[in-house]
Amino acid sequence: MKKILVLLLLIFSSMAVFSSDLIIDSKTQTFSDKEKKIKLDGGVKVKLDNLTVESEKADVTIRRNNKLDTATFYNKPYAYEINANKKREVKANILKVSLINKVVRAEGDAQSVITEGNTPIVTINADAQEYDIKSSVMVCTGAVTMKYKDIDTYSDKAVIIADEKGGLKKIDLIGNARVKQENNESEGHHFVYNPITEEMSVSGNTKTVALTDDGKKLTIHSDYQQYSKKQNSYIGSGHVKIWFDDYFAQGPKVSVFPDAKTGKPNEVYFVGRSKIVQQDKDIIADKIKMTMEPKDFQAEGNVRTIIHNIETKDQEDL
């Protein structure tokens, strides 16, 4: 009876500290004064604000001031948060919920799914995921994969920021990052994606491969790249190199625009002292425009052409 009274006092005194309601349900609840833990078994269900966590087994650690600290859920627990018509679900081997800081940490085969209505819009898998309920910021680490609409990503780390309605506002992919969207694949050290404007930037040894309608590859290497899905355009800067068919071009800055009819990447503009190589010819100029269909290029400003391996032979005296 004494332990039950102590348990109730701990829960209610902690709820007085929180600015939100904390509800703990389970088949059995015991308090260990030696371990400073509340142990929960059977049908465990904890509700904090909009967050609900369910598992078969859990424990709650107690601080020295007898306030509830961290709730740990075992045996593949399940958590969910409902915000308007969006639902965030989290599954993992272990879930840890900081009752003071309102941070949820998922460890081991962690998966988060955000649905709008009945439609999944985001699925994230990682070794570990940490979600701050107050700031709506999620940090994922370890073999992070994400599917967002038509975008598939991989990275060592990801930081996802949601808006007040639960929708995505910003996605950061950090370390060995790769992104695939339709026929385009990109890689680099750091990706930043804005789901609202559908614009993406990538820095650090970047590479993009875009497929044309006839299956040919347009490959872009640079220090920095920016992509707009709405305009289907690319901007690259810093040691830019481009390969297409038998063309190779390089320069300090490039812009790639789509064909007005097909919407596919077709026009490439180099600005600054640039060079284009085709077979045995090098053309160097201040500006170079290259088109892929029909395949052609134009060079302007201090143009120099170098033709390699010209064959010559001595004429015989008549």
Q: Could you tell me what each predicted segment is?
A:
Residues 1-318:
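Mature-chain termini and adjacent capping regions
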